[in-house]
């Protein structure tokens, strides 16, 4: 499994549920080549469910520089390949718990492009500050323990 891109902003802006889903993406050949060289952006992208089908919106895949023929829209809506029971499960959670679905990372699994998605709830500003404080405190503790162990 080779990770191409991770949506780091998602971990900061959203509180994620533990269950994550793996979805395939319906792409063109030149889009796959472009993803392979890392020309992809997940910022501001989200998953939209319509008519029992899942779509990813605002995922930007830049044009492959060596492609001669196919011109495509870089921000086009792409269909996600999920099992029907997973789509129904996600749709029910969105309705009942007021959650949103966001992409976490894009990776290759046996030469197939996969997308890891998760249900999430947006964090408020004070929650983001508290998360940063906790992270800084953990870093300080690790540094002091490391220095203490080196002195002995």
From Swiss-Prot:
It comes from the Bacteria. GO terms for cellular component: cytosol. Pfam families: SmpB (PF01668). Keywords: Cytoplasm, RNA-binding. GO terms for biological process: trans-translation. InterPro entries: SmpB, SsrA-bd_prot, SsrA-bd_prot_CS. The keyword Transferase does not apply. PROSITE patterns: SSRP. It is found in: Cytoplasm. GO terms for molecular function: RNA binding. Required for rescue of stalled ribosomes mediated by trans-translation. Binds to transfer-messenger RNA (tmRNA), required for stable association of tmRNA with ribosomes. tmRNA and SmpB together mimic tRNA shape, replacing the anticodon stem-loop with SmpB. tmRNA is encoded by the ssrA gene; the 2 termini fold to resemble tRNA(Ala) and it encodes a 'tag peptide', a short internal open reading frame. During trans-translation Ala-aminoacylated tmRNA acts like a tRNA, entering the A-site of stalled ribosomes, displacing the stalled mRNA. Belongs to the SmpB family. This is SsrA-binding protein. It comes from Onion yellows phytoplasma (strain OY-M). The gene is smpB.
């Amino acid at each position: 499994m080779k990770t191409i891109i991770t949506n780091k902003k998602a971990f900061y802006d959203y509180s994620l549920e533990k269950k994550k889903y793996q979805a395939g993406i319906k792409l063109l050949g030149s889009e796959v080549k472009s993803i392979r060289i890392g020309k992809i952006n997940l910022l501001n992208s989200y998953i939209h469910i319509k008519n029992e089908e899942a779509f990813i919106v605002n995922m930007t895949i830049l044009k492959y520089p060596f492609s001669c023929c196919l011109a495509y829209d870089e921000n086009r809506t792409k269909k996600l390949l999920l099992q029907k029971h997973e789509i129904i499960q996600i749709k029910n959670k969105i309705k009942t718990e007021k959650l949103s679905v966001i992409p976490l990372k894009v990776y290759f699994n046996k030469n197939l492009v996969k997308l890891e998605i998760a249900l999430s709830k947006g964090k408020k500003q004070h929650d983001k500050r508290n998360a940063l404080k906790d992270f800084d405190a953990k870093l300080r503790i690790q540094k002091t323990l490391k220095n203490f162990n080196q002195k002995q």
